[in-house]
Structures are given as structure tokens and as C-alpha cells.
């Protein structure tokens, strides 16, 4: 037997009854010593590796479908298929299979799997009864035909024999002629029988019968037969829907008649499977496997034919980006691409890779960048869906495009910034589009799917790009909504307007595109008609929660990039302002952000938190929560419990020294007493170490170490104030949206800095950096509805042994009004510290009170 090689694709059927592409190669039939018999071998055309080695078993049932497919099952729930490029190759391999099994190549199935009882009955049949005798195709025989078709469905052998009889006698076309006669005569009984007959023929699961039934000549009559379900009082109107309601739109004329016919056929067959046929029972689920395969291979063929027609795709892209294209036409073009990408999901990874590379080569991403910035909501939605297909399949391709784009475009029109601003400006009250876009951004900035090669690292390059060009756009709503500086708020509002008008100008988009109501200032999430941010607007809170979720992801997965950004922007302080939001879910998002930072157990972050006194808004929120033991209460307790269990010494000392008096009344958990115990144990250990050192060395070393540490920390944390724009951890280029500030803002900042310098000189000196003031609202009175009173807990300053006093500027707290989204903590040096009387805090009510 000659070793004939033919080009094929190898498919396997997965658990979801979908065909998985295992690769393309050349098939041969040859004797394999290890398998002790003739076998089918497929070697990959790319590298010659073995894709398939399958012994031709004498008892295996092979089926030939659609002239170019051979399908068989090797084991339970393991189906294989060979899809041939040429019919001649399929015929030759089919002959080899039939030769090994001793079967007639003219039939399209070698045999079928049967149970023992079926086999016994089959052996008892006379040899002359090879095919089933069909009744004559007449109106008065329809009931008999229906009974025959339904009776064979339980027997694989009889199903096969009936299929052969139907095929050989051209019976289906005769049945469809009877259908037309029954409709003309309004013969309801006959129409009900025809429904059972056609449905039964579909369940025969024969590709050759499908090719007849789904041909242009027959398919609408098949649909007509399936309208007359006896279980329904009135027939359905499926043909009316397919011919009148469902309109086939050629966005670009398709010149290939075979392609057009294939598209029509696939749509109608999919409609039959999804809409007309009832959901198969557990006993029928395998009856339509061939129908699923028929649709699958049709879709593969459609995508391949379109992909190979570069003239067609080039014309689609040209019209999509042409300024002269009207809105309706552009909407159709975008919807076509959306459907095209949806079809591509039937392809396997190798084929999808080629498909998306073709789209990328033709310019899909620049085209998306244009249409995503348009004012048509339907177009933007479809463009977002296409973008999601691209990101899901190849985030690296999208990242590579935006990094190249950054070299020749302004930040405002970068694709990722357009995506971010679409998220920010989502007009949906539930922010459905914003949630989808946030998920795409999360995929793009996820280091887990970034590539690393010997020449370059995608992770470092892309994250540098993202933090330099995009992060300021993402955090703009957060910084705006937590700012007490009117000028800063005005800048961000102006930035929104500028960005959208810039994107929609003719030089960067289409001449007809102008900032519409959907993307104008009036519809920035949470803004009102007076161009002011509504800080506790529910939609604003939802958006800020999404942004915080993304920033929390950055803290977990990025290293020095997000650390630099948090330090330079004092971002955690701004986030903790949201602890005072009336929306608990937003306060929890802010708390989760801080919890992730503390969870890293990074001393840089810990010193930043203690220096900025950033536990204060968290503790204020806990006390303001009163006796309500809800999710917020539990989340705050868990934060402090983590610090206790992990024994984070710097944070433990800070909490106990500064806040223990306010927290000691909380006794329903042992967290705070446990922190105090940890603190005292550590203090005892330090004292023991000091006592073991000679006094003169202890004095010198203590003085030197304390001073050095103090100076280092002051230098490190004030570095950003003294040297504007200098990175704290690593020299990453810092985003500077301030470059676009109006001149009057620059003058304002100069005046503000001058005033700050004066304030620093006029601040009262203290003997030690240890003293500070802690103001909080009494939780019990807040919970009981009474007026909250501010209570000041003065911690006595610690004195060093003979060391000179050092003037430091520590933050002074201000009690926030409940329900307003303002800062719980003033920024350092904003105003002189006011001396307040010392008093002790009231105890927090316990569970039993």
C-alpha cells in the first residue's frame, strides 16, 4: 500500500461538543509495527512532528461527511476528524480505510456501534433486507412515514439504513413537495406528520442528508415543516422572520457567490439549531452532533474565505476610517467587524492567531481608536466588544501598539487613554461599560501575561509607559473628588473637557464628530450642571470604587512603579478621604487599598503611613461607626488584627503610642489589647538590650542612632516637597499633568509655596517630634444620634537625653462632618496648629450596653 500524503487539519471533539483544532499536516496510511496494523499518520507541516497516529481498527465506525471530512470515535467520548483540503485526498484515504475493513467505499459509513441485542437481531435479518423499504411518497402515507422515521431513532443500524434509503431515492425533495401541497390544501394533520418526519430526519444525524435539506432549494421548506409543531395551538412564523425581519446587509458587496451562499446557509442552520429545534434531552444530545459540526466547519470556511480576501477587508477598513463615511454606514461596518470577530472564536488558537494578525496588519487598532472616541453610543459599544476580543486573545499585541503610538502621539489620544476616558465618562447608571473596560485595562496591566525575552522585557517597558502616560488619566477622578483645593479641581475638570474636545477634533477624528452630551463635561460621571463634582453621588462612588479596585490590583502586582506613584502623589492620604463617604462600599474599597499596602509588609510603606499619620481616618471611621458591628467594623478590625498577628513592629508602636487611649474601650475583640501587649514586650526587649550596654556607649549610640534615623526619615519623606518631581524609590519619569495648567494656576502655586514657607517659620517649636494631636468624633454619640464632640488626646512628648529640640511639622487632624466627602486629615503646613484643651476620650459602648 503506497504512502500517499494529503494536506489535512486534525480535529478532536471536546467536552463542550466543540471541535478543537490540533494542527495542520499531511496524512498517510501505512503499517505501524508498534500498533500491529495499518494506521493513519498525520505529521505537522511546520516541523514534521506527529499530530496523529491512529490504527485503522476493523470494528471502528468511520463516517465520510461533506466530501472532505472523515469522522470516527476511538474511545468513549473521544471523537476525531480529518478535514481534507481536497476531495481527492479524502476519497483516497477513505478507500484505504474501507480496504482495511473490507467495506464498500461507495457508502459513507463503514459500520456503526451497536449493542449486543441489536447485533443479534441484525444477524437474524435476511441478507436481502439491506435497505428499509420506504412507503410511497403520497399524502395518505404521511402517517405511516412519520411512524417509520420515529421508530428507527433508537436503533443505530436502522437509522443508517433509513438514511441510505432516503438518500438513494431522493425522498426528501418529494416530501417537501407534499409539504407545499398540504399548505395549499390547509391540511393541518398532514403538516403535523411532516413536522415529525423532518424532525426525525434531522435526528438521523447524517451529513449527506443535511446537504440536501440545507441547500438553497430546500431549506425554507424544511423551516416551514418545522413551523407546524403539533404541541402548539398556532404554527410559528419562522419563514417570515428569516425572509422579512432578518435582513442580510452587505457592508461591502461580496462578489464571491459561494461565500454569500455559505453565509446565508450558516445563519439559517444556526437558527434551526438554536431557535426552532427544542433543547435535546439527555438521551438525544448526541443526535445532533453532526449538525453542530456542520455549522462549525461552515464558520471556519467563512472566516478563512474572508481572511484570504484582503481586497474586501482593505475596503472595509478604508470606509471605516474615511471621514466621508456617514454614521449609518460606519455603524454597519463596526457591527460587521464585531460579528466577524465573534465568528473567529470558533477558530482554534493557531487560526485565531493568523486571523488577528491579519486584522492588525490592516490597521484594526488605529481604526478602533477613532471609533471608540465617536459620539454614537452603539458604535462605541461595538468597538469596545471588538477591543475586548483583541485584548482577550493577544494583550501583547495591544501593548506593543500603544507603546509605539506613544512615540508619535500626545497622551490625550493614546488608545489606552481613550479607553480610560470612556470608562470615566460612561453614562450608564450602573456603569456596565465602565466595568467591562476596567476588566480590559486590568488584563493589559497584568504582569502575568507579559512576555520576557533576552533582548527586552515587556513588563518593565509597558509599566514605564503606563505610569508615565496613562496613570494620571486613570486617577484624575479620584484626585479631583478628594481635593480640597478648588484650583486643582478646576484643573481636572478642564482636563476632561480638553481631552474630549481634542479627541473629537477633525484632525484626530472625523469632521462630523463633536463632543456630544454623552461625552461632554455635563456627563462626566458624578458632575452636575454647575461643573462641580458631587462628591457623594452614587454614580461617582461606583466609578471611584472601580478605580480603587484597579489601583489595588496595581499594589498587588506592580513593584516600584506604583510605590513611586503613591509616594509622589501622597495617594493613600487622598484615598483615605473616602473613608468618610456615606457609601459604605466606597469606604471599604479605600480600606482595602490600605490593607493591600500594609499586607506587603514593606517598611517604606510603613514609614510613609506612620509619618503621614494615615491610621487616623481609619480609626475615625471605626469610632464613627459606633456600635454597628457591620462589614466596615469587621474590615477595620481585620486590618489591625493582621498587624498584630504579623507583628509589624513599626506600625504596632505607632498605633499604641498615638491611638491606644481611643481604642482601649473596645473589648469585644482582643486585637487592641494584643497590640498593646506586643508593644510592651518589644519595649521590654529594647530596654534589656540597652541595659546590657555600658552607659556611656548607650548614651552615645542612642543619641547618634536616633538623630540619624530622624534625619534620614525627614529627608526621605520630605524629598518630594523639596525637590519637585524627584522619584522616591527609583528614577521613573513622573507624570506631570501640571504642565498643562493655566498660567494663573502656576502663579497660585508660587504664592502657596511662599505662604507655606512663612507658615513653617511661624510654627510653634516643640521639644520633641513625638507630640501630636488626635481629634475624633465620639462614636457612641454618633451612633445614638446625638451631636458628636471633638475630643483631643494629647500624647506627652518623649524627651531625649540631652538632645536639642527639633522643629518638625506633623499633621493636625480635623474632624470631618459625617456624610460629606472631605478630608479627615489636613495636609501638612496648610495652617498653623491650634492649641486645644486636653481631655480624655469617652469609652466606646460595648455590645451589651
Curated annotation (Swiss-Prot):
Where is composition skewed (Acidic residues) in this entry? Answer: 714-724, 827-838
Domain of life, source organism: Eukaryota
Residue ranges of domain WH1 in the record: 1-100
Q: Where in the cell is it found?
A: Cytoplasm; Cytoplasm, Cytoskeleton, Microtubule organizing center, Centrosome; Nucleus
Please name the GO terms of the biological process aspect recorded for this protein, alphabetically. Answer: DNA damage response; gluconeogenesis; positive regulation of gluconeogenesis; regulation of double-strand break repair
> What protein name does the entry list?
Serine/threonine-protein phosphatase 4 regulatory subunit 3B
Gene Ontology terms: cellular component: centrosome; chromatin; cytoplasm; nuclear speck; nucleoplasm; protein phosphatase 4 complex
Q: Name one GO molecular function term.
A: protein phosphatase activator activity
The family annotation for this protein states: Belongs to the SMEK family.
Q: Which Gene3D superfamilies match?
A: Pleckstrin-homology domain (PH domain)/Phosphotyrosine-binding domain (PTB)
Q: Which gene encodes it?
A: PPP4R3B
Function, in words? Regulatory subunit of serine/threonine-protein phosphatase 4 (PP4). May regulate the activity of PPP4C at centrosomal microtubule organizing centers.
**Region spans: Disordered:** 714-849
Where is the organism placed in the taxonomic lineage, from the top? Eukaryota, Metazoa, Chordata, Craniata, Vertebrata
Assembly and oligomerization: Serine/threonine-protein phosphatase 4 (PP4) occurs in different assemblies of the catalytic and one or more regulatory subunits. Component of the PP4 complex PPP4C-PPP4R2-PPP4R3B.
Show the disulfide pairing. Answer: none
Modification Phosphoserine, positions: 117, 695, 840
Keyword Aminoacyl-tRNA synthetase on this protein? no
Sorted alphabetically, the keyword list is: Cytoplasm, Cytoskeleton, Nucleus, Phosphoprotein
| Biased composition range(s): Polar residues | 776-818
Query: What spans are recorded as compositionally biased (Basic and acidic residues)?
Result: 733-764
Q: Does the keyword Transmembrane helix apply?
A: no
Q: Which organism is it from?
A: Homo sapiens
- Distribution of this protein across tissues and organs: Moderately expressed in tissues and specific brain regions examined.
The record, for InterPro entries, names: ARM-type_fold, EVH1_PP4R3, P4R3-like_central_dom, PH-like_dom_sf, PP4R3-like
